Amino acid sequence: MKKEEEEINMKKILSIIVGLILISTITSCQNDKKIIENDLKNLIEFTRNGGYKSSNHDKMAAITFEAIDEGYKKMSYKINKTTEENKNKIIVNITIKYPDLSGAIEIFKNKILEERQRLLKSPNPTVRSDDEMIKLTTQFLKESVNEKLNDPNLRYFEDTFDIVYVKHNDNWEMQDSPQFNKAMLFNLHFNSFTQN
C-alpha cells in the first residue's frame, strides 16, 4: 500500500476508536464534567471489552482491532482531573499506561516476507482469495502482537495528557487527541510497514 493509503487507514481506525459508542456527541446535562468523565471511561472500557467487534468498520480496522485485542488487558488508566475551562470547553487530564507494541510491525513484516518466500519456492503457488488473505493477514498480525506482548522485555509507556471536549449546539464533542489515539493503538505505526 502507498503511504497515503496507510495514513488514511490509520485515520479511519483512530476515528472508529473515538466514535465507537457515539462518544463524539454527549447530551448536555446538569453535571457536564461527570457525564464526560463517565463517557470517556465507558469508551475505554467498551474498547477493552471487545465492543468494537459489534461496530461496522472497514476490513483494515477489523483486522487491527482483532490483532491488538490482548493489549487492552495490559492497559490501565486513571482520570486525574476534569476542569471546566468555560461553559463550552471541558478538559480531562488522564494518565494511560500501555504496552509498546511498535516492534510488532517489524515481526509482522518478517512473517509476510517469509510467507512470500515460501510461496515463491513452492512448485505450485496457491492464489488466495481476498477472504483467505484477510484471514492470513489477521493471523500474522495477531501472532506478531502476541509475540510482542509475551516478550519478557516488553516496555510500557505511561503518558499523562489532556483530552479536550468542546460544546457544539448543546452537545459535547471530543476533540482529536493524537496522544489518546497513540495509547489506544499501543504505539503501532502502520505507515512504517511501507518503509524500508
Task: Show where each model-derived region lies.
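Positively charged n-region of N-terminal signal peptides that target proteins for export
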Residues: K2-K3, E7-I13
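Sec-dependent N-terminal signal peptides
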Residues: I13-I23
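C-terminal motif of bacterial Sec signal peptides marking the signal peptidase cleavage site
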Residues: T25-S28
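Core segments of small alpha/beta cavity-forming domains
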Residues: Q30-E84, G103
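A short hydrophobic beta-strand element
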Residues: N88-Y98
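Primarily extracytoplasmic ectodomains and periplasmic/lumenal surface modules that are beta-strand-rich
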Residues: P99-L101, N171-W172
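Mixed-charge, low-complexity intrinsically disordered segments
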Residues: D100-Y156
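Short beta-strand edge/turn micro-motifs at domain boundaries
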Residues: E114-V127, L149-Q195
